[in-house]
Amino acid sequence: VSLEDYTAFSSRFTSTAGATGKGTASLRKAFSSANVIDLFILESATDTQLQKASISFKNDLLAAIDIKKMITDDVVVNDGLIRTVDLVITASVDKRFEGIEGTITPQIARKVQNYFLSTNRDFGEPLILADLNRVIFELSDVRYASVDNLDKDIHIEFNEIIQLNNLVINISLV
């Protein structure tokens, strides 16, 4: 059983209450705890948001893993960390959209929200601004876009996941 197996199992697991979540596995690096597997878990709150896993979810997960794990492995369930991000995006569009800019804003919002869906993000995955811009540029009406409130990419630890909190979209006519 590999760490990838534990990660896949925890991310596909459904509790007795029907809850799902997302997880990642890590092996402790101390000689005395060489067979201790740390699972970092978050439970799905909605289709777009994760939350700290409930005790019942963790208990169900541990019980399900206990049947599948190697006998020498000791699995410990920990809470994953959610790093929320607020974004202010300015998108430049052609002047021909003057008066109807409001039709482009929801399209951009949908693209950004899909980018941050919990099914599209992984633990330890950084927020690369160029990738986010690339997603926005898939809209043919957008000439240019920038994230105004971030100067650089956001890098996180292996047990953290980035989640969108607030989104503000400004439209600039060019």
Predicted regions and their residues:
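Immediate N-terminus of the mature polypeptide
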Residues: G80, D86, S92, S118, ...
